[in-house]
Amino acid sequence: MNDAIAWLAKQQEPMQDLLRSLVDTDSNSYDKAGVDAVGAHLIAALEQGGIEVQRTAVEGFGDLLLAELPGGSQPPVLLLGHRDTVFPKGTAPARGYTTDGTLAFGPGVADMKGGLVLNCFALLALQRLAPLPFPVRVLFTGDEEIGSGTARDHIEQVAQGVQAVLNTEPGRVSGNVVSARKGGVRLLIEVTGRAAHSGVNHADGASAIEALARKVVKLHALTDYGRGITANVGLMSGGTSSNTVAPAATAELDIRFVEVAQWAAIKAAIVAIVEEQEVPGTQAVLTECAVFMPMEGRHSLDLLDIYRGQALELGFSVEGEFTGGCADSGFTASLGIPTLCGLGPVGGKVHTDREYLELDTLVPRAQALVGTILQLAKRGQS
């Protein structure tokens, strides 16, 4: 057992202490002060260990934080983690971190404050073996839960030239890691029509609701389960009163797909549907609100084998799992970079008031993460 793995074996209590601090700090995606406060805890933990953190200011959202262990000339390894959660400000004071000794509970405990802890302790452990044959970077972002609008370009920039990306989103309930994810796009459709009294001069109106309803039927027809494509309009609103022909209507569309190459054709079909004027006197506008690219597993088969081997050496087994959920790992995987996700501690019921994390997975998952990085180092030297 090398020094880094052995050191991690003694870090259960410090890891839980940091986890408690993070969970007890509100960090909704739109709460910049809260997301930055979580960042302050991470900065303190790393700087106490002698690791500097670079901050890139972001207006309106959490700043971007980058820490790096210097290394040799081999391509770097990048770790990812997001500091924001879906829970509104005030959740942590109302129901903060608790534990029954086996499980930890609290807002974002699994998604993904447990993963942030792993990233910190992985870097601190690897520092004990420095210098490595390559730099190891950790990027902490602040708006993943709402689409990574401020983070995507930075993620892709920092990932340029890296040999692998390891994202510590929560491990699956099964204990598995994530080897493939769907891509997802959220779109806003805004339809305008012409108001009229529904009894006095109905024919003078142009119903935005009718036009939108016709589009929804066509949009839902884009679903193709055999190809892994789904279309879902989950929100609709419109009109001013029941006796007025609706002058406006809006809908939010969620699209999921499994291959990067699918998106261009899907988008073209959506644009054609939105632009079609089914009801004379109406028009529609389409806006992309959030875009996550899919994480295709074919890029990461070797990386998954390395992680599985490290897990077995530590006494637990994992497989790669596919999920329909999206994550920042899709951005790097779509660039062809070997990427694994779901490497964080095992947890479940995320985004609910019953979210939990299995405390006894903190150390072994951190060890497997570090072991994977060290195995990449050995492979590069062979």
Regions found by a protein language model. Give the residues of each.
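Acidic/His- and Gly-rich active-site-bordering loop/insert found
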Residues: 2-107, 128, 132
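Short beta-strand segments
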Residues: 80-81, 139-141, 166-169, 190-192, ...
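A structural signal for isolated positions on well-ordered beta-strands in alpha/beta enzyme cores
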Residues: 78, 135-139, 285
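Short glycine-aspartate micro-motif
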Residues: 76-78, 104, 163-167, 188, ...
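Metal-dependent amide/peptide-bond hydrolase catalytic core
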Residues: 1-3, 27, 50, 54-57, ...
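Acidic/histidine-rich catalytic neighborhood of metal-dependent amide-processing enzymes
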Residues: 112-182, 381-382
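Glycine/serine-rich anion-binding loops at beta->alpha junctions
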Residues: 87, 102-118, 197
